Design a protein with these regions (language model features):
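FAD-binding glycine-rich core of flavoenzymes that anchor FAD
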Residues: 1-18
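A generic structural signal for well-ordered coil/turn residues at beta-strand boundaries
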Residues: 13-15, 30-32, 52-55, 62, ...
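A short, Trp-centered hydrophobic/proline-enriched beta-strand micro-motif
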Residues: 13-26, 59
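Cytochrome P450 C-terminal beta-domain/meander region
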Residues: 28-42
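Flexible, small-/acidic-enriched active-site or ligand-binding loops
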Residues: 31, 47-48, 70-108
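A short core secondary-structure module
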Residues: 44-76
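Residue-level signal for inorganic ion chemistry
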Residues: 59, 66, 91, 128, ...
């Protein structure tokens, strides 16, 4: 409770709590290369959102999970590009002092990564559903040759593919969240969610852009925001090949 009071007190007032979980070449690793030894934190994290504005950073390390301030001595922030244009950073920790009461008791990198992937999956499912709704409304009201685009068989078939991907992504996300909340093993479902998001969400976003025609490329129109979000989430999770390797590893170990 003392840790909750300390680190979460400002959230209700708008303070940002960000997470530094991924490392160069390793998306959400359960065995981070970042070390926490003798009260000193060392390592590099990438794809850390809003690190500069955050009040605290949740950092996964080899021996636990620690909360540090981005302004602490030994913390260096390097801004990196993102598809959405949002604030994203690489964060380097060099002998950063980690107080004993800043180490989250009972927390592990594996558990934090489970919760992070579940949240990312739910966010992505919402983004795909939003793009589907936006596209369906557009083709229903945009006319060509005297009839709505949605009445053309090819358009309807392409939109159906987007619908299938959207519903299966939502199903995978809901399954993961239910299993985690019920205290059940969710590792297999999480691997499927990660792969389905990274392999299916980007192509259906391309389809939505295609169905919008030139309107989809207009930055004053919201379609590009959905696609940019999915591109960033796919990169955060390591891409489809990386995620497929994790699914294969689970299959070979069972």
């Amino acid at each position: 409770e003392a840790q909750q009071d300390r680190f979460l007190e400002g959230v209700a007032k708008g303070a940002i709590l960000s997470a530094a979980l991924s490392e160069p070449g390793a998306s959400l690793p359960d065995r981070p290369a970042t070390t926490l030894v003798g009260g000193k934190l060392n390592g590099t994290k990438v794809v850390v959102p809003y690190a500069e504005q955050a009040a605290w950073l949740i950092v996964t390390a080899d021996t636990g999970v620690v909360v540090v301030s981005p302004t602490a001595d030994g913390v260096r922030l390097t801004k990196t590009p993102a598809s959405t244009g949002g604030d994203e950073f690489a964060v380097t920790f060099t002998d950063v002092a980690a107080e004993p009461d800043a180490v989250l008791e009972g927390a592990s990198a594996h558990r934090v990564n489970q919760l992070a992937l579940a949240a990312i999956g739910a966010f992505a499912a919402g983004a795909v559903a939003g793009a589907l709704k936006l596209t369906a409304n557009y083709v229903a009201n945009r006319e060509q040759f005297g009839r709505p685009l949605s009445t053309f068989q090819t358009v309807a078939a392409q939109l159906a593919e987007v619908y299938i991907a959207s519903r299966t992504l939502a199903l995978a996300s809901n399954s993961v969240i239910w299993r985690l909340s019920a205290g059940r093993d969710a590792d297999d479902d999480l691997d499927v969610l990660g792969y389905w998001l990274t392999s299916q969400a980007p192509p259906v976003m391309q389809t939505c852009h295609h169905l919008h025609g030139g309107m989809g490329m207009d930055i004053t129109y919201p379609m590009h925001r959905y696609y940019s979000t999915i591109k960033d989430l796919t990169r955060l999770l390591g891409g489809p090949s990386y995620r497929l390797d994790l699914v294969g590893a689970q299959c070979s170990s069972n």
